[in-house]
Amino acid sequence: MISLLMIADDFTGALDSGVQFAKAGLKVRVVTDLNYELENAGDDTQVLVFDTESRHMDAKEAYNRVYQIARKGAMYGVKYIFKKTDSGLRGNLGSELQAILDATEEAVMPFFPSFPKMKRITKEGIHYIDGIKVQDSVFGADPFEPVKLSYIPDIIGLQSKADVKTIKLSEKFTGDEKGIVVFDAMTDEDLSARASTLFKMGKLNIMSGCAGLASIIPDVISLKGKINDSFSIETDGMLVVCGSVNAVTKAQIKYAENNGFTKQGLTPREKTNRDFWSTEDGLKSYDKIEAAYRQNNLFIIDSNDPEDSSETKEYMKSERMNLSETEDTRITCGTYKKTLKDWRYQSSCCYRWRYSCWSPK
């Protein structure tokens, strides 16, 4: 039976917070089908996680997606609804928190933005990444959706009509607050203490935060599961498809290259022509990727241009494409299937100069 429903705005977030519950031994199911019916989760599912893929949508559409799922959860009688937010405050923060409030008709939405283990903390309502304000961090330098503010009520207020209150570590939560309440936290102990207080007051039926909150919530609300001490995964290799422009991710890819992985880039045509992968040239590209993978099954496909290169930009210019067109169409490579001897991939590749996903099937 579903005890907690989580709503994340992207697949990475769905996984990095869902796994916090799995670590506690809980049965977690992650779904990407927005029409998925909760009764189909089965009696053994304790935590159901929806990936709405709404981070890069306009605020209204993001609101609608989150509202529909939260409303479904409320009508189904799920005890706890958790809005998973980005630890760097990207995405449609205000509209999605507002959607949870409206769908559940709860009076207050507690928001815990901190992720202390990752050095992401909130102090006096201001969010910090590695000791600097979020607007001055890598999230503020995001080339697509930079976080331009650091005071969280200001960020929420861009998309929400709700009252927003901040509560410092030295201040008390009375239980009479309305709207969205942002809690300071600089350690996991801060998160646990505050969340425990709200739980005892019956004010934690809905909640919001990132993986930092997810990591402490099972203990706070006494969600129990059986931890499997003998879990292993056997694999003959690893295929990574990266489209992130985040500096940390780029460093991780470089580290992997230096430790045995082979990296292959994509041409501008492969990235921006949504019909490419169904063409003869596209099928040949598949074959080349397969052959390279067979040479080294620790393999990275990187959709970013080489450092200091503008080849994709120049290609788009020559083809009379512009960024607004890629925003409208999301330069989707479509959903394509190909059997590669004894292995198959179904890849849903969304090129927005930032994102692509390739998943084994």
Region locations from a protein language model:
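Cap/lid and interdomain-hinge subdomains that line or gate substrate/regulatory clefts
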Residues: 1-3, 31, 46, 62, ...
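N-terminal basic/disordered segments at the start of proteins
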Residues: 2-44, 112-117
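Short beta-strand segments
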Residues: 7, 49-51, 83-84, 110-115, ...
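Hydrophobic alpha/beta core scaffold segments
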Residues: 14, 28, 77-83, 202-205, ...
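Short acidic, glycine/serine/threonine-rich loops at helix termini
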Residues: 17-19, 92-96, 120-127, 193-197, ...
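Short, structured active-site "lid" loops
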Residues: 45-60
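Conserved, well-structured core segments that form the ligand-binding/active-site neighborhood
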Residues: 129-285
